[in-house]
């Protein structure tokens, strides 16, 4: 009688060999769409400006005009919005490159831990940026009668429309980042089934 060490095959290893690869492609597609959404939000808000000329006074029959330009740089919340979505775009671009070219390099699962943490931080950053922009957008659309802040969207309609489109794109990117974060955490917590050595009696 001799003892022979036999490796126990992983359950479902052969029929589901395409499963992890398909899941990886799904995650890559989610990251790519999230990149497009946050990049669109960044570009639209960063390029958002509108110039209008208003009559501010009249001396006799001569109107006094003033030219005013609305730009995202005038509002710190919109500046933060551009920075947050820009960093979210860079994050997803780096993650896509990492999954595509350096997937094989993983030291004791450290890669998945780092990816999960960065995904959560990026989602939190985008959430802060878009919510700050929503607050200022609501203030620009409706004003605040208690603080005597006038609305501006009745005068700068194009500026507000472009800002609203950027906010919608950012919310899409945020939703996708939340889904990506959940997938990253599931990948991190999912136990891996190592090969189990079993002793088989051989005649």
Swiss-Prot record:
Record's bilayer topology term? Multi-pass membrane protein
What sections of the protein cross the membrane?
A: 25-45, 77-97, 115-135, 166-186
Mind listing the UniProt keywords for this protein, alphabetically? Cell membrane, Membrane, Transmembrane, Transmembrane helix
Q: Where in the cell is it found?
A: Cell membrane
Instruction: Please give the residue ranges for the topological domain Extracellular.
Output: 46-76, 136-165
Cite a GO CC annotation.
plasma membrane
Family from the record: Belongs to the Casparian strip membrane proteins (CASP) family.
Tell me which PANTHER family the record gives.
CASP-LIKE PROTEIN 1U1
The name on file for this protein is: CASP-like protein 1B1
In its UniProt entry, the species of origin is given as Ricinus communis
Give the source lineage, highest ranks first: Eukaryota, Viridiplantae, Streptophyta, Embryophyta, Tracheophyta
